[in-house]
C-alpha cells in the first residue's frame, strides 16, 4: 500500500517533502516563484484532488498541481502579503478562503471561482492587538452540514460566524467563558451523527457548542492536564466525531501532548509518544483517504507519524526548521533525485 507524500511547511525552508515514508527528504528546486528558503505558514490539500496543494507564503498564495514538485504564484489582490491560512471547500474546490496577517494587515479573502476573482470580507480587523502586536488569521472552518455556514478566528481579534456563505460575518467570541477568548488558534465543526458540534481552541481554553455558537461549554487545559496552551485542533476529512488536539506549556514551549477525542470533544484521551517532543505540537494532519495515517509537527521541527490513528507513534529522524503546517497526500509525488537535499538515514532505511 502506498504511503503517499508527506509535506512539511516551514518558516525558512518552504515545503519539504518525502515520498518514501521519511527515508529521504527533498526541498524545492530552483527557478520557481516560491523560493526554496521561503516562509510558508499554511499547507492545504485540495480534498477533491489531493495532488493539488495550496501554500500560504510570504509572497502570497501559491499553488502546485503535482504534489509540490512545481509551484506557481497566484495573482490575487493580496499578492506580496503574508498568508497564514488556506482552506479549500471539500464540497466545491472552486470555493477557497484565505487569511492574511502579520507582518501584513490581517484580512479574510474569498474566491468562488478557483481564484479568478477575489472578494475581501467586510470585517473590521484592527491593525494592532495586545497579544501578538499584529493579528493573524489562523483558523477557518466549513460546516459539514450547512455549506452556507463558516467560521474564522484571529490570533488575536476574535471568533466570527457566517450564515450566508461568507458574505456577512458576526463576531461571537463574547459568548465564550473565560479571559483571553479573543485569541483563537483553531476551529473544527463536526456533523457528530446528527448532533453538530463546533469546537474552538483558544490560547488557554477549549470550547464546545451544540447550538451553532449560541452557548458554550469547555475546559481549561491547565486545570485538566497541567499545560495551559492549546494549539493544534484537527479532524480527519469527513469524520463525524474524531478530533486531535495539542497542548503545551507555551509557545514555543518545552513539552507537549497530543490528545484524541472519539466523541466530538466531549472527552479526551492522551496518546502515548515514544519520546518527549522539543516544543509545542503546532500542526496535526491526516491522510484524507486513510484516517489512520497521522502527521504531527512541533514548533521547533520534530516530526511524529502514526499509521494506527494515534495509538502508537514514531519520531522521524529528519528534523526541520520551524514547522508551521503539515499535510499527508495520498498521491506519491514524482520527485527528481537531483532535488534531494539530504541523504538516506541508516535508521530510516532499516
Task: Pin down the residues of each PLM region.
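Extracellular glycan-interacting surfaces
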Residues: 1-350
Amino acid at each position: 500500500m502506498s504511503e503517499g507524500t508527506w509535506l512539511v511547511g516551514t518558516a525558512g525552508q518552504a515545503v519539504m517533502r518525502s515520498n518514501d515514508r521519511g527515508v529521504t527528504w527533498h526541498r524545492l528546486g530552483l527557478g520557481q516563484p516560491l523560493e526554496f528558503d521561503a516562509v510558508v505558514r499554511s499547507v492545504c490539500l485540495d480534498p477533491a484532488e489531493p495532488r493539488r496543494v495550496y501554500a500560504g507564503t510570504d509572497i502570497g498564495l501559491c499553488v502546485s498541481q503535482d504534489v509540490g514538485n512545481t509551484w506557481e504564484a497566484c495573482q490575487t489582490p493580496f499578492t506580496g502579503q503574508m498568508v497564514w491560512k488556506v482552506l479549500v471547500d471539500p464540497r466545491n474546490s472552486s470555493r477557497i478562503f484565505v487569511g492574511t496577517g502579520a507582518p501584513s494587515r490581517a484580512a479574510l479573502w474569498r474566491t468562488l471561482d478557483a481564484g479568478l476573482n477575489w472578494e475581501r470580507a467586510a470585517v473590521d480587523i484592527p491593525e494592532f492587538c495586545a497579544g501578538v502586536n499584529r493579528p493573524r488569521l489562523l483558523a477557518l472552518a466549513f460546516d459539514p452540514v450547512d455549506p452556507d455556514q463558516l467560521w474564522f478566528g484571529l490570533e488575536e481579534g476574535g471568533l466570527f460566524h457566517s450564515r450566508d456563505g461568507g458574505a456577512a460575518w458576526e463576531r461571537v467570541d463574547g459568548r465564550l467563558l473565560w479571559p483571553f477568548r479573543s485569541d483563537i488558534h483553531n476551529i473544527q465543526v463536526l456533523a457528530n451523527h446528527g448532533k453538530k458540534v463546533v469546537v474552538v481552541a483558544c490560547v488557554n481554553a477549549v470550547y464546545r457548542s451544540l447550538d451553532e455558537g449560541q452557548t458554550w461549554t469547555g475546559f481549561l487545559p491547565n486545570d485538566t492536564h497541567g499545560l495551559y496552551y492549546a494549539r493544534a485542533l484537527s479532524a480527519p476529512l469527513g469524520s463525524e466525531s474524531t478530533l486531535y488536539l495539542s497542548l503545551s506549556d507555551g509557545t514555543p514551549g518545552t513539552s507537549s501532548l497530543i490528545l484524541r477525542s472519539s466523541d466530538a470533544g466531549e472527552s479526551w484521551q492522551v496518546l502515548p509518544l515514544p519520546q518527549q517532543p522539543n516544543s509545542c505540537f503546532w500542526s496535526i494532519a491526516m491522510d484524507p483517504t486513510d484516517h489512520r495515517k497521522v502527521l504531527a509537527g512541533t514548533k521547533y521541527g520534530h516530526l511524529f507519524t502514526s499509521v494506527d490513528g494515534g495509538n502508537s507513534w514514531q519520531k522521524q529522524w529528519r528534523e526541520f526548521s520551524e514547522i508551521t503546517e503539515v499535510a499527508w497526500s495520498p498521491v506519491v509525488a514524482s520527485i527528481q533525485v537531483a532535488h534531494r537535499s539530504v541523504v538516506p538515514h541508516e535508521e530510516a532505511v532499516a
